[in-house]
UniProtKB/Swiss-Prot annotation:
Protein's recorded name: NAD-dependent malic enzyme
GO (cellular component) term, any one: cytosol
Superkingdom field: Bacteria
GO biological process: malate metabolic process
A single MF term (Gene Ontology): oxaloacetate decarboxylase activity
UniProt-listed Enzyme Commission number(s): 1.1.1.38
Organism expressing this protein natively: Vibrio parahaemolyticus serotype O3:K6 (strain RIMD 2210633)
Length: 562
């Protein structure tokens, strides 16, 4: 722990020490440390505090005009001095989260090979499939407890970015630390380079990944299996988060491994957890229950269906039957409402089709039922967008919803901002300020008829850092559906709008540490209850969470021999 007051004993010195991001202090090395570690003459004379370093770094940060340049600058600090990076980000979390993660990280992934400065994490390519154990042994961090891994095929709403997808694991793990207090020494970003089907990447002379069409089918599955087994040999207790895998792989991988190892898929389960938490808060603010809602989804991929299943589980926990809950959820994709008998549906979509008996009296304007048809016939009270298709929550759709629902709950969750189904400004205007809105990307508050409406960012960063902290605090062996449900309920209790009747649906990011600790406690307690972690008292659990929570402060160094 960096907040430990005991000194760290360091076996190397000089430029090697300054080149180690986890240990480098830059101008904050004390006079004693400069003498002991052969740093004299390598740094300017003045010894600074970390706060003075933060002030200089922030001044430099503000000098950059574009978000991409700011992203590159912050990544450079991260690769030079991690303690300074996290202190800077924590001091300016609301301002910098959109720079280190969505939406800016999307452009960083698209331009990964062009802005590449220094390697971070592991690039495990298919040609090295027989040497994965060796590659894991080369990782800079040896005591890894949290891994975020992607194959780069479905990066946000931007599609196949090949190894450019590495920007996502790097960004996600930055938030595990900045929001959830997990030491960066315990984290490892990984990209599985199985090629790319993106013609722009393959034709780009700057592209740094394996120039080959994507490996698929049994060869792909065998490669992922070997990776999982190698991780189990190297770090058997590590939490693995699957990130931005394509729909055809995301759910099958989760189903294959969730009962074998400690893992979860943030796109499916994390998105579901934060959405359910936000919905619970919205329902409380509106004076109703989730089980009484009629919910329409635009987007029936793995993320949308994962959210729907989590909502159904919560509705059932409130006392209605599974069949009744499913009858209140309407999944719409490019072909219209998912109905029984539709061809080419995936297994996880089949569970969410509407029965013909539920729609036989509906009116429509063509074959099947469009989103607008569903608005007119089902009269939903909740509308969730996970389509990645901008503008599909049209004025006609929102106004139709508002006709039969005084306080519609509208969540356009697609990332990045360019892919959002509707802007909060439009939704607030079209509903005369009565809609409850949360988005996937950050938006400024909306001013409508003299009133200011703060817009909650329904961002997974409210959930996954707390899940990770809870898992690490009790060394949980699995991440169960019940643990994820508890994370949603814990998040809902933090809602300013639900508690006070004003403010945003979700708490400000400046309170994210308190939120993460509350979620960690709920998740860890459920893990203990389910027998996937050793039993400890509530007091001991709070202590374990506090002990696990890393703070970006410099520790004293003492030199020791190898």
């Amino acid at each position: 722990m960096n907040n430990d007051k005991r000194p760290l004993y360091i076996p190397y010195a000089g430029p090697a020490l300054m080149a180690t991001p986890l240990l480098n202090k830059g101008s904050a090395f004390s006079a004693e440390e400069r003498s002991s570690f052969n740093l004299e003459g390598l740094l300017p004379e003045t010894t600074e505090t970390i706060q003075e370093q933060v002030e200089r770094a922030y001044q430099q940060y503000k000098s950059f005009e574009s978000d991409m340049d700011k992203h590159i600058y912050l990544r450079n600090i991260q690769d030079t001095n991690e303690t300074l990076f996290y202190r800077l980000v924590q001091n300016h979390i609301s301002e910098m989260m959109p720079i280190i993660y969505t939406p800016t990280v999307g452009a960083a992934c698209e331009n990964f090979s062009n802005i590449y400065r220094r390697g971070r994490g592991l690039f495990i390519s298919y040609p090295n499939r027989d040497r994965i154990d060796d590659l894991l042994n080369n990782a800079a961090n040896h005591n890894v407890k949290v891994i975020v891994v992607t194959d780069g095929e479905r990066i946000l709403g931007l599609g196949d970015q090949g190894i450019g997808g590495m920007g996502i694991p790097i960004g996600k793990l930055s938030l595990y630390t900045a929001c959830g207090g997990i030491s960066p020494a315990y984290t490892l970003p990984i990209v599985l380079d199985v090629g790319t089907n993106n013609p722009q990447r393959l034709a780009d002379p700057m592209y740094m990944g394996w120039r080959h069409p994507r490996i698929t089918g049994p060869d792909y599955d065998a490669f992922v299996e070997e990776f999982i087994q190698a991780v189990q040999r190297r770090w058997p207790d590590a939490l693995i988060q699957f990130e931005d895998f394509a729909q055809k792989n995301a759910m099958p991988l989760l189903e294959r491994y969730k009962d074998r190892i400690c893992c979860f898929n943030d796109d499916i389960q994390g998105t579901a957890a934060v959405t359910v938490g936000s919905l619970l808060a919205a329902c409380k603010a509106a004076g109703t229950q989730l089980s009484k809602q009629r919910i329409t989804f635009l987007g029936a991929g793995s993320a949308g269906c994962g959210i729907a299943e989590a909502i159904i589980a919560q509705m059932v926990s409130e006392g209605i039957s599974d069949e009744k809950a499913r009858s209140q959820v309407y999944m719409v994709d490019r072909w219209g409402l998912l109905q029984e008998g539709m061809p080419n549906l995936l297994d996880f979509q089949q569970r969410l089709v509407q029965k013909h008996s539920n729609t036989k009296e509906w009116e429509n304007e063509g074959n099947g039922f469009s989103l607008l048809d569903v608005m007119r016939n089902a009269k939903p009270t909740v509308l969730i967008g996970v389509s990645g298709a901008p503008g599909l929550f049209s004025q006609e759709v929102i106004e139709e919803m508002h006709k039969h629902c005084k306080r519609p709950i509208v969540f356009p969750l697609s990332n990045p901002t360019s892919r959002v189904e509707a802007t909060p400004n439009d939704i607030i205007r079209w509903t005369n300020g009565e809609a409850l809105v949360a988005t996937g990307s950050p938006f400024d508050p909306v001013v409508h008829e003299g009133r200011t409406y703060p817009i909650a960012q329904c961002n997974n960063s409210y959930i996954f850092p707390g899940i990770g902290l809870g898992v690490l605090a009790v060394n949980a062996k699995r991440v169960t559906d019940e643990m994820l449900m508890e994370s949603s309920r814990a998040l809902a209790t933090c809602s300013p709008l639900a508690i006070n009747g004003r403010g945003a649906l979700l708490p400000p990011l400046e309170e994210i540490h308190l939120v993460s600790k509350k979620i960690a406690f709920a998740v860890a307690k459920k893990a203990i209850e389910q027998g996937v972690a050793l039993e400890i008292t509530d007091e001991a659990l709070n202590d374990a969470i506090d002990q696990a929570f890393w703070q970006p402060v410099y520790r004293r160094y003492k030199r020791t021999a190898f």
